[in-house]
C-alpha cells in the first residue's frame, strides 16, 4: 500500500521557506493499493493527487470544514476523468454530502457549479461502502464516530490504516 500525505495543515494553505519541510497544503491523504484508491479529504493538497484510472476510486470526507473541501475543484485528473468516483462521508447520508458540497461549489460562491458539472461523482451512503468495497476489493471500510473525533479505517488482510481527525 502506498500512503501519501498531500496536505496536513488546518485552516488555510500557506507558502514560504518556513513551510518547505512539512508543506503548506490543507488536509488530503491518498491511499493506493493494487486493488483500489482511497482519498480522504480534498483540502488544497488534493490538487496533487493522481486519480487512478485502473481501479475503483473512493473519496471520503471526514467532515466539511473549508480546509477539508477547498481543493476539490482544483484537481486536473478529477476534471478530466469520465469514470466513476465514489464520494461519501461517515457523518451524513449521501444526499446531505452532495448538498453540502453543492452549497460550497455552486455558481453563487464558486465560478462553476462543480457538483452538477461532474456527473461521474457518485454519492453513496457510508454504510453501503463496506459491502461494495469488501466484495470488490477485499477492503473493509468502517467508521467509529465518538464526540468530535472521526475515525475512518481501511483494512486489507495484510495492511491496516487508520485516519484520525479531531475536528
For each predicted feature, which ranges?
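Binuclear metal-dependent hydrolase catalytic cores
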Residues: 1-167
